Amino acid sequence: MSKASDAVREPLVDKNMAGSKPDQPWMVYLSTFVAVCGSFAFGSCAGYSSPAQAAIRNDLSLTIAEFSLFGSLLTFGAMIGAITSGPIADLVGRKGAMRVSSAFCVVGWLAIIFAKGVVALDLGRLATGYGMGAFSYVVPIFIAEIAPKTFRGALTTLNQILICTGVSVSFIIGTLVTWRVLALIGIIPCAASFLGLFFIPESPRWLAKVGRDTEFEAALRKLRGKKADISEEAAEIQDYIETLERLPKAKMLDLFQRRYIRSVLIAFGLMVFQQFGGINGICFYTSSIFEQAGFPTRLGMIIYAVLQVVITALNAPIVDRAGRKPLLLVSATGLVIGCLIAAVSFYLKVHDMAHEAVPVLAVVGIMVYIGSFSAGMGAMPWVVMSEIFPINIKGVAGGMATLVNWFGAWAVSYTFNFLMSWSSYGTFLIYAAINALAIVFVIAIVPETKGKTLEQIQAIVNP
């Protein structure tokens, strides 16, 4: 055992405060708030194009093809951000990666605000996509690494809540202001994240990994409070880091070694099922789904946005009590039911049956679907991904898992209209089948991680 490791075994607590009531972890709350400003920025980027589409096309005389390229560049930029964010977060720290993400988003929004033609518009969209993709990896990782095990799941779920809120706020405000003003508003959460990072500590686990032991102890002390005894947690982190440091530096092919394969399978599998269960196709084309079913589009979109935020928010307090696995199972079951109800609706419409039931069933199916997604499959894959990778492969593995997620988002959104043209009810039956497979996957492969430290989880998953 090294001297640094021996040192942290001394009781790291102010003896004058021993036995007193522990501090509230206010710095954890502040750090999480700053981090999820990035999540809100993510949602603002994702929700921008829908309310701005008509005005941008009119003001800049864009063709459908040009605006379609503008929309797709967000996902392309996000895939680049996803695959590079892991190495960046390992090199300059979690805070450094969030600063890079914020800077890309700000530059992208400024390019959109001052765009006079399609080139500046597209470059701005690509930059915001890069920032969004990087945020999607580093925010849940940072929160998981700073949060106490007792409420880590709830805090990590805030990432998904703020993404949903950002999308909904962009949609609502976008109906009231011009597209340039909406882009200007998009800068606010990015700037809040960038500035807020100066007032919070770096991830203690990253500091320990890079050998900055004094800063590691100071950051952990700041996060846990002056009255907390951090000696046990500090020793566990240091011991685990030392064990991992004896291993060679992780490369891409190392992810498929026996010691890591289960964590890779869990994370990649959850990302695949989250996306290929249909969420982005249904999310991006909700208005057209309601229109095809004969339900008022604006009313349906408002109900959709509110339900998504409310269910995700209600889910946060129970994550650390109910556990990750039960929420995933309940969520996937609800997704199957929602898809089947929507499939019945479109089957009736195609075969010209029960006309009055078609719009009702369509709305019920979509709302059951989005409510179920928000209850588990929306947030839990990110929570689990942030917990299961050892820190020596977290950058490579987490970046690749995020890339898998963004590729799935692109693939589903790209193919959705083609599938609906082929068979509207068949599309939802395919999604129902994929979500049914997700239930089997969760039961057979995914472990329960609630109430355990990251080091305990990784020891179980990667023995």
Swiss-Prot record:
Gene Ontology annotations of biological process type: zinc ion transport
Major location (coarse): membrane
Subcellular localization(s) per the UniProt record: Membrane
Stretches assigned to coiled coil: none
Listed PROSITE patterns: MFS, SUGAR_TRANSPORT_1
A GO term, aspect molecular function: sugar transmembrane transporter activity
Membrane topology: Multi-pass membrane protein
Protein name: Sugar transporter ERD6-like 7
